[in-house]
Amino acid sequence: MIAVTVDGIRVELEEGATILTAAKQAGRWVPTLCYDERQAPFGACRVCMVAVEGAPKPLPACTTPCRDGMEISTEDAIARRVAVSVVELVLSELPAAPAAHTELAQVADRLAVTGEPRWPGTVHEVEHDYRHPYLAFEHELCISCGRCVRACDEVQGAFALTATGRGFGANVTAGLDSGFRDSTCVSCGACADTCPTDAITEITLLDGLERNGSREQRAL
C-alpha cells in the first residue's frame, strides 16, 4: 500500500493505482470525457489534468500512477484552465449545445463553460447513420474520445468500430466505412452506453416509427 494526499486529504491505495482513483477515494471531483472505469485508461481528452507537487506541468489523472507521498491538487488554477480550454474547444466543434443529460453537458456545467462557444467557427456536419435497426449514429456529435471503439473492442470483442482521421477530421467509422448495418456490429449497445455526447444512441420503437415516417414522406 502507498499513501498520497489529494487536496489535503490523505488516502491509502494499492501501488499502481492512478491519481484519478486516488481522487475518487478522497471524494474529490476530477472532470473526464474519455474515461470509463470499465475500460483501460486512454488519456486522450486531457480534461482530467491535475497538479502534482514537484511536477513541472499538470498531469492527466486517469493515466498517471500514484507514488508514495505524492501531493495532488485537483483544483489547481493552471490545471483547471487546461480542462476548461479543452471543453471549450470540444463544444466549439459541435453544431449545437449537447443535451443536458449527457456527460459532456454535465462536465461543461461543472466547469462553468456555458453560453456561446468561445471560439466559434467550423462545426462538424456529417450525415447521420440511421441504417442500423437498433443504433443511431449522429457523427456530428462525435468528439473522438474513443470510448465507443474501446467498448466494442475491450468489452464486446466485436471490433466493429474504428477511429479514423486526425484533428478536426477525426471520426469513428463502422466496418470498412460502410455503416453500422453492414459492419460486424452485434447490437450489444456497449458503444451507446458509454458515449458521453449521444453521438451513438439506441433506437426506441418510437424513434424507429418517426424515422420510417420521415422516409415515407420524403418518398412521396
Question: Locations of the language-model features?
Answer:
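Eukaryote-biased recognition of intrinsically disordered, low-complexity regulatory segments
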Residues: M1-I9
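Short low-complexity stretches enriched in small and charged residues
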Residues: T5, G27-W29, V126-Y130
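Short glycine-rich loop/turn motifs that provide flexible caps or phosphate-binding loops at active sites
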Residues: D7, E15, F42, T164-R166, ...
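Aromatic-flanked redox-active Cys/Sec active sites in thiol-based oxidoreductases
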Residues: G8, D36, F137-E140
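N-terminal cofactor/phosphate-binding cores enriched in small/glycine residues
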Residues: R10-D68, V82
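Fe-S ferredoxin-like electron-transfer domains
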Residues: R46, A55-S187, D193-L220
